[in-house]
Amino acid sequence: MEELQSFLEKDRSWXQHFLYPLLFQEYIYVFAHDHGLNGSIFYEPVNFLGYDKKSSAVLVKRLIIRMYQQNHLICSFNESNRNRFVGHNYYSYFYSLMISEGVSLIVEIPFSLQLKSSIEEIHNLRSIHSIFPFLEDKLSXLNYLXDILIPHPIHMXILVQILQSRSPDAPSLHFLRLFLHQYHNWNSLITPKKSISVISKENKRLFXXLYNSYISECEFLLVFLRKQSSYLPLTSSGVFLERTYYYGKIQRILVWQNFFQKTLWVFKDPXMHYVRYQGKVILGSKGTNFLMKKWKFYFVNLWQYYFHFWSQPCRIHINQLSNYSFYFLGYFSNVLKNPLSVRNQMLENSFLMDTLTKKFDTLVPVIPLISSLSKAKFCTVSGHPISKPIWTDLSDCDIINRFGRICRNLSHYHSGSSKKQSLYRIKYILRLSCARTLARKHKSTVRIFMQRVSSGLLEEFFTEEERVLSLIFPQTTFFSLRGSQRERIWYLDIIRINDLVTNF
């Protein structure tokens, strides 16, 4: 129990900051505008009403004055609900957007202070591709994989409570709770059907800050339990069970004790690996199916009794890795088994020995990529290329550069695939869509347009990355879509997923 308490204090000591006074400082809203995820929201509404940038600064000062008067602030929220699009009452809606960005920035400050101290040490590991070499080394030795869809709390107040456990700044949290309560009553922040699942574009930053605190709390408890499980051979089960009391409220102690009295001791697993991405979690283990069911049982009860919301067990799928292909960060990944027969010679006798090797394999998901291209209006649902009418107002060079950039980015991101033949079809769709767009702009057919221009017009921008790779590896292999179908390259400069990859 003392060990858990010290673990809690050490992990949460960084949160001893009182940030509420920052809400009444003008420079906070300037920072939120300059560095926010949606920096343009400060000027789009006022420009719509004819205000200039100087007038927006005046509105910030008016907002700070209103924030000193809590009742007036609540009235302004209600007023914005009734008059969002009526004349000059639109400034109330503008106030709500500024508060959302300002609160988001303040909530992010403690997390950014914690992240800044460690980000330089893991600079190379920031690349998305750095995960795949790790999976190549580890997954081939595992037996089971749990695919977990992280549930969302059904109410925003749960996220605020989670944030409260990490920050003693009660005034800021009280203001945030008041803001969310008032904002919940109208549709600009959250739809009335679900209070958290659908967030409008201008409030993604606030939701992301609250959601990250929730994920951080989940992983904090998981890391603690994982660390303690390694000491189980040296600790009696009775003493270890006392530590689970901290996971729930006082009234939940007996429930938690009954749930975990016969399960915690089987959590010993020296080869468990955890990867989180896009609201999902991959939990790999070298243990048995029974052990994975115990972890599933733990997650379901963690969400129910610690975070106080129900999570369906069907959100956690346990699969045997040798018979399972999973979608992960734009790839279909699986573990291939390759049986080998080796002839051994001992003196005058020889015999055959059968061995089994495992290899982590990554494939390009063609059908989902075509679906993404279809949603982006580059082709039909069946993969037939079509023109991009909204780009016909651009110059020919801009059109070619846009199509070429998309193709190069997809090739760059999927360079780790062992079978790149699938990219030929994606390249064909983008190339023909580019030709159709140019032909439409010049009011011609694709055949006539291609006869007029040089044959290398559409070939140049697709081969730029291949030329770069040939300079990096001049004496080894010629890396291209044709010459490196089985060569896998993982880059350290990919810090985000291509939009087309995440569009399905």
From Swiss-Prot:
Keywords: Chloroplast, mRNA processing, Plastid, RNA-binding, tRNA processing. GO terms for cellular component: chloroplast. Disulfide bonds: none annotated. InterPro entries: Domain_X, Maturase_MatK, Maturase_MatK_N. It is found in: Plastid, Chloroplast. Usually encoded in the trnK tRNA gene intron. Probably assists in splicing its own and other chloroplast group II introns. HAMAP family: MatK. Belongs to the intron maturase 2 family. MatK subfamily. This is Maturase K. It comes from Eichhornia crassipes (Water hyacinth). The lineage of its organism: Eukaryota, Viridiplantae, Streptophyta, Embryophyta, Tracheophyta.
